A protein has these predicted regions:
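Short, positively charged
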Residues: 1-259
Length: 259
């Protein structure tokens, strides 16, 4: 049996995974729920420190090839989306547990596809590990979510010209639909028009950070695919997502985890 060691704080927890019949039976009766989704679209300003750090590391704008990652004071966006998923305590953790799932690009300074990485609230120094992207996409196919989602970052806009016309209108509709349903928290004081303006400003290839805007569009698409599920399907998907990230289930071998 293997051992998985995760970065921990002062107190460690040991858990056996995929070892006993009871573990698998608990998995079968576990039904987690999505408690909240946050994808902030409020404007952030690129700071002098961010620019200086990027230049010191020799970073170039992946869209233009110019030195640095935007201009000081220009608009950008937060890089991630966060799901909060609640386990009522029947399942493998054996107690009530809340998971924070961070969704963001694989590359924080360039165009990339998304990754899904949960942590256990209260164990924030110990990440469960990234969910295998291919398995997440397989899950999405099972639930019919690929009708609304595209996993390849290359098909998304990478500048203000691409993010215009019908494409812009489509995202405006998607954001409004989720905002009206209060499915996603887009940040304090953010309405649909503000969200679209901030995304467009971030797509400025000379001043902004277009790879961040592109990642945000991917995240919005994922959220919309989740939004279009029934409440029961949504819960089932979130449950499977957590198990996939934790490599829990009969497709994986037995191991012990210290976190």
């Amino acid at each position: 049996m293997g051992i998985s060691l995760k970065k921990i704080g002062n107190k460690a927890t040991y858990k056996e995974i995929n070892v006993t019949g009871k573990f698998f039976r608990n998995m079968q009766v576990t039904h987690m729920t999505l408690k909240s989704a946050r994808c902030e679209l409020g404007a952030k300003k690129i700071t002098e420190k961010q620019i200086a750090d990027a230049l010191a590391r020799g970073k170039e704008n992946p869209r233009t090839g110019l030195p640095g990652l935007g201009k000081v004071g220009a608009v950008t966006l937060s890089q991630d989306t966060v799901l909060m998923i609640f386990d009522p305590g029947i399942g493998p953790e054996g107690k009530k547990t809340t998971y924070k799932v961070q969704i963001k690009g694989n590359n924080s300074t360039g165009f990339s596809n998304l990754k899904w990485e949960p942590t256990i609230v209260g164990k924030s120094s110990a990440r469960m590990g990234k969910a295998t992207v291919a398995l997440v996409l397989d899950l999405m196919k099972v639930y019919g979510m690929m009708k609304y989602y595209e996993p390849d970052n290359k098909v998304f806009p990478d500048d203000q010209t691409d993010f215009s016309g019908k494409v812009l209108t489509e995202y405006k509709t998607i954001i409004k639909e989720m905002m009206d349903a209060r499915f996603v928290n887009f940040g304090p004081g953010v309405d649909v028009e503000t969200a679209i303006i901030n995304i467009r400003e971030t797509f400025n290839i000379y001043r902004g950070q277009p790879w961040v805007a592109s990642s945000k569009l991917q995240q919005i698409r994922f959220l919309y695919s989740l939004f279009k599920l029934s409440p029961q399907e949504r819960s089932d998907f979130c449950t499977s997502l957590i198990f996939t990230a934790g490599k829990e289930g009969k497709r994986y071998g037995p191991y012990g985890k210290i976190f």
